[in-house]
Swiss-Prot record:
Pfam families: Pterin_4a. The lineage of its organism: Bacteria, Pseudomonadati, Pseudomonadota, Alphaproteobacteria, Hyphomicrobiales. Keywords: Lyase. GO terms for biological process: tetrahydrobiopterin biosynthetic process. GO terms for molecular function: 4-alpha-hydroxytetrahydrobiopterin dehydratase activity. It comes from Nitrobacter hamburgensis (strain DSM 10229 / NCIMB 13809 / X14). This is Putative pterin-4-alpha-carbinolamine dehydratase. InterPro entries: PCD_sf (IPR036428), Pterin_deHydtase (IPR001533).
Length: 101
């Protein structure tokens, strides 16, 4: 099982992640990605889904038209772990392929 990050480590990791923030009232991180249209948003989700499945670590997410809202936390660890940080980094890299910084 992945170990939950300390508060200091979590804050430092989130600070280094473009667009991500801590979720109020919950030990989790979140980001909203906005694409040009639904096709791009869905394409992003499809690519992320492959990464998530390969790593057996799945996001909580919601898609409305061109927006994808994401929350990451490792439920078994009760908070944010290195697995969440790595998935957030991968999501940012995939979003950049669509021109989303």
């Amino acid at each position: 099982m992945a170990e939950r990050l300390s508060e200091d480590a979590r804050k430092a990791a989130v600070k280094a992640l473009s667009g991500w923030s801590e979720v109020a009232g919950r030990e989790a991180i979140a980001r909203v990605f906005t694409f040009r249209d639904f096709n791009e948003a869905f394409g992003f989700m499809a690519r992320v889904a492959l990464v998530a499945e390969k790593n057996d670590h799945h996001p909580e997410w919601r898609n409305v038209y061109k927006t994808v809202e994401v929350v990451l936390a490792t439920h078994d660890a009760g908070g944010v772990t290195e697995r969440d940080i790595r998935l957030a980094e991968a999501m940012n890299a995939i979003a950049r392929q669509f021109g989303v910084a």
